[in-house]
Design a protein with these regions (language model features):
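Binuclear metal-dependent hydrolase catalytic cores
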Residues: 1-131, 140, 197-218
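Catalytic metal-binding/acid-base residues of hydrolase active sites
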Residues: 16, 38, 135, 156, ...
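Thr-Gly-centered strand-to-loop micro-motif
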Residues: 110-111, 131-133, 153, 185
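Binuclear metal-ion centers of metallo-dependent hydrolases, dominated by the metallo-beta-lactamase
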Residues: 138-218
């Protein structure tokens, strides 16, 4: 979740989205920003209805065309010409290749990475970059990341995987970008316990965890 000038924005809403919001005591939410259309990243969208009710407004949803196609399929009742009371109310905004504004004078820059053959979006905001579900990243897209001070990147496990960075690939990418700090996310149960992971990581690289808070400039 990004907390910017008193407003909260989440990147992706997976199956445990509702529980995450309750645990972190999130009272308001300005927007949901999607990286891609896989179920573990979109299946919590229905639960924005609680914020609709509490804040008396539509939820801003940012997604590219391929994600919007999936949302229309999975949540057809949200987009139907005739709807029933209580459905989630969303205001969908299309992510193109250019940077876009999510708060006053605050923009996100989309970064295309490849999740095997599926394009997935990472995002840069100021000196912070978040990337999930990456297996390869083009040199052109890497240029958007250079200069990042805080890098969040996926590292599924130690052994190779078809569509995700493993530990070796993630560490190689981190070394190439050379941020001040890097955090590993999208870690599977096949990896190890957090303390054991941290024990073998290079300096200034850490395993992320639920509830972790990272200050950054935007």
């Amino acid at each position: 979740m990004l907390s910017l000038d008193g407003e909260n924005h989440v990147i992706d809403a997976g199956p445990d989205f509702r529980n995450q919001m309750l645990i972190e005591k999130v009272k308001t939410l300005k927007s949901v920003i999607f990286t891609h259309e896989h179920k573990d990243h979109i299946s919590g969208l229905d639960d924005v209805r609680a914020f609709n009710f509490k804040e008396k407004r539509e939820m801003n949803v940012y997604a590219n065309a391929q994600v919007q196609f999936a949302l229309h399929r999975e949540y057809h009742y949200i987009f139907a010409a005739k709807t029933y009371p209580g459905i989630p109310k969303i205001n969908i905004q299309t992510i193109e290749k250019e940077s876009f504004e999510i708060a006053n004078n605050t923009t996100l820059t989309p970064i295309e990475v490849m999740h095997y053959k599926l394009p997935v979006l990472g995002f840069r905001i100021g000196d912070f970059t978040y990337i999930t579900d990456a297996k390869t990243i083009s040199e052109k897209e890497k240029e958007k990341i250079k200069g990042t001070k805080i890098l969040i990147v996926n590292a599924l496990r130690k052994t190779p995987h078809l569509s995700h960075f493993n530990l070796e690939e993630a560490l190689s990418f981190i070394a190439e970008i050379a941020p001040e700090k890097a955090y590993l996310t999208h870690i599977s149960h096949l990896f190890d316990k957090h303390d054991n992971i941290n024990a073998v990581l290079p300096e200034r690289v850490y395993a992320a965890f639920d509830g972790l808070q990272i200050p950054f400039n935007y």
